[in-house]
Amino acid sequence: MIHIEEITKEYPTKTLFASASAHLRPETRVGLVGRNGTGKTTLLRMIIGEDTADDGSIRQRPWLKIGYLPQELATPTKFTVLQAVHRDKYPEHEAKRILSGLGFEEDDWNRKLETFSGGYRMRVALGHLLLSDPDVLMLDEPTNHLDKNTQVWFESFLMNSKMTMLIISHDTKFLDRIVTHIWEIRDQQLQECRGNYSEFQKLRLQLDTQQASAAQRQAKEVARVQKFVDRFRYKANKAKQVQSRIKQLDKIKVIEAKRDAKRLRFRFPEPTPSGKMVLELHGIRKQYGEKVVYENLDFSVARGQRVALVGENGAGKSTLLKILSGIL
């Protein structure tokens, strides 16, 4: 369906892909993995034409319908939830079914998007994408804004769909349950593996172990040959053998063992001593449209406390942080 052929993508300080190739086959569900910054999102954007490769090509059938959900989305807020999902193109009853699965109550369907949190707006965008039933569904961290119940429904939807999928996710359990193949971005290449994430991890460990052993054997052989060259370089009766060994060394393609990821070390500077009470809110009220988020809310944080802010999506967690920081 989609053929990625010998693509190269470079930036001034970094090369993401160097003659990388892969093929997305019909009705496969592929998890795209790799360290942060290796080019996962860039690859999706190149497939849909929002970015271009410096060399190589990405070919797809001309009739292919691709649906793409990025990590962040600017959803038009003038629509109601229901309008944003069906867009006067798709059956309303199907839109309602998907909205229910994504955690929207019937009372929510005719509310304006602007009254919802960013997480719920992403759910609306996801709902529209699922309703559009593309040939290829590409998702970038789709579970970030889903709670447990909606994720169960979402996974069931994907498993019962015949769409071909290319999914970026750091949720390895989600990948284990959903994908049939893994593409790993590694050493500027796309490496394909059949199976889910756990199966890929086992194979990757085996390959890394084999590569480390091969690198060690090669290093010993190079050292042995180099020792011969150094010892007999200036001996006339060994000149032919020395030249042969030098050519042998020149032809060797160095095997590199996998290096462990770099560990970042940092520390926060000591802050200026604060008062005993760091933050205080009294009688706070916040409303979006007709939706009341807080009513007579009291909140305080004392010096030295470490507070976890939890709640359902749309409960007002981000709004509270914005109020505390003075943005709202």
Regions found by a protein language model. Name each.
Residues M1-A215, K262, P269-L328:
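ABC ATP-binding cassette signature C-motif
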Residues L203-K258:
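Intracellular alpha-helical coupling/juxtamembrane segments of multi-pass membrane proteins
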Residues D230-F232, L264-R267:
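Short hinge/gating elements
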